């Protein structure tokens, strides 16, 4: 199911999320302590990461410890389901235990590939000025499913914004070419198109958009065909 687009949380919302996570971690610590002391484990209560005792107390300790480990990972940045699963698979070798951990994380709302993809796209567009094709490749590498990628890219990639980012990169690259060649009169337009076009393609911009933007920038800079 496609979730509505989430706006950037304000300070109050972020503070509430941090308080919630702190509460979850505290409850998990109490849960582990109770199990280690041989006491009856608390029921689910308000914490979806605590599900009573899974199989036995020793296994339950593993489950809640790994849930806490994932919370630590998510404290640094959001992660896709595939990333979380891969991290856990390095630490947990019993399939049913790993699946129980994933189930609890999902119940707690900590697995959200569409939300992860949206945050990833916004961050990478801002920091690296990546185009849609490059972002799609990165999300595929992160294990995000095609429908989630399509949804996020469709709502966050209007043509005008893509063109603006392409123009910024094209101008930066062209400025370097002009400095190296000593001016527009010394710059080979065909060679500049190939070099800058290749750089933009590697950033994920389409050939049609790249040619459109580059030719306009070259015209504006006075770079002619030799």
For the regions a protein language model found, what residue spans apply to each?
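An alpha-helical, amphipathic repeat domain used for nucleic-acid recognition
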Residues: 1-226
């Amino acid at each position: 199911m496609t979730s509505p687009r989430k706006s950037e949380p304000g300070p109050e919302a972020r503070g509430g999320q941090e308080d919630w996570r702190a509460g979850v971690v505290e409850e998990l610590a109490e849960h582990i302590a109770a199990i280690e002391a041989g006491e009856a484990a608390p029921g689910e209560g308000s914490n979806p990461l605590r599900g009573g005792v899974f199989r036995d107390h020793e296994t339950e300790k593993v489950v809640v410890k790994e849930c806490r480990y994932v919370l630590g990972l998510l404290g640094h940045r959001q992660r896709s389901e595939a990333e979380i699963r891969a991290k856990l698979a390095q630490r947990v070798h019993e399939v049913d235990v790993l699946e129980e951990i994933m189930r609890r994380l999902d119940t707690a709302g900590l697995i959200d590939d569409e939300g992860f993809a949206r945050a990833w796209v916004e961050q990478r567009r801002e920091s690296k000025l990546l185009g849609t094709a490059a972002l799609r490749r990165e999300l595929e590498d992160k294990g995000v499913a095609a429908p989630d990628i399509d949804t996020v890219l469709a709502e966050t990639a209007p043509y005008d914004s893509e063109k603006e980012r392409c123009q910024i990169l094209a101008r930066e690259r062209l400025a370097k070419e002009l400095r190296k060649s000593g001016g527009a009169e010394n710059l080979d337009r065909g060679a500049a198109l190939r070099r800058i076009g290749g750089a933009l393609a590697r950033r994920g911009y389409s050939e049609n958009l790249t040619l459109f933007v580059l030719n306009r920038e070259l015209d504006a800079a006075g770079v002619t065909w030799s």
